Regions:
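Conserved phosphate/anionic-ligand binding catalytic regions in large, soluble enzymes, centered on
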Residues: 125-135
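C-terminal nucleotide
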Residues: 1-124, 138-176
Length: 176
């Protein structure tokens, strides 16, 4: 018992079912308001929350840290450029899945944008920024960019321009 691997520790020590505030307070032997120093913003979150997905959130954080190191190691590796791009794309896709499913910081628009990117030549795509309506980044081979950008404009942005959500003249601010 007691792994040095944080992901194994998450599986061993945190249940997959959400925790209630009362369960967390019992485990920590302290009231949650005192843990957050009675910060008004934190108290508002505590009052609104009915449960806390500690297993999922911790699994996301530790797996994301592992992916960051994997990304760095891949960039610095002796793999061929093709192998590097494939591996980096896979890491980006894994990151997006984790953000979406474990951390739940995606939204339908980002899910659609990431899917459109992957369907139109991106080796990997993921949300970036704070999530909950942020941006997406896609890994595309230089040769494929000339087809990728028009495809994303057509399959994702066109309907948003037509609805007035995005201004056509601002397109280069959104897609580059």
């Amino acid at each position: 018992r007691g792994s040095s691997d944080p992901l194994l520790a998450v599986k061993e020590y945190l249940k997959e079912e959400p925790y209630t505030a009362e369960e967390i307070e019992k485990i920590l032997e302290e009231k949650l308001p005192s843990i957050v120093n009675n910060d008004p913003t934190s108290l508002a979150v505590l009052n609104a929350a009915t449960h806390f997905k500690l297993h999922q959130r911790a699994a996301h954080v530790y797996s994301e840290a592992r992916r960051v190191h994997g990304f760095k190691d891949t960039v610095n590796s002796n793999l061929s450029d093709e192998e590097k791009l494939k591996k980096l794309g896979d890491l980006m896709n894994e990151s997006h899945y984790s953000c979406s499913v474990l951390y739940e910081c995606s939204c339908p628009e980002l899910e659609e944008l990431v899917q459109v990117c992957k369907e139109n030549g991106a080796l990997g795509a993921r949300l970036t920024g704070a999530g909950w309506g942020g941006c997406a980044v896609a890994l595309v081979k230089e040769f494929d960019v000339t087809q990728f950008i028009p495809a994303v404009k057509e399959k994702y942005y066109k309907k948003r321009v037509e609805k007035g959500v995005v201004k056509k003249e601002d397109m280069e601010l959104y897609l580059f």
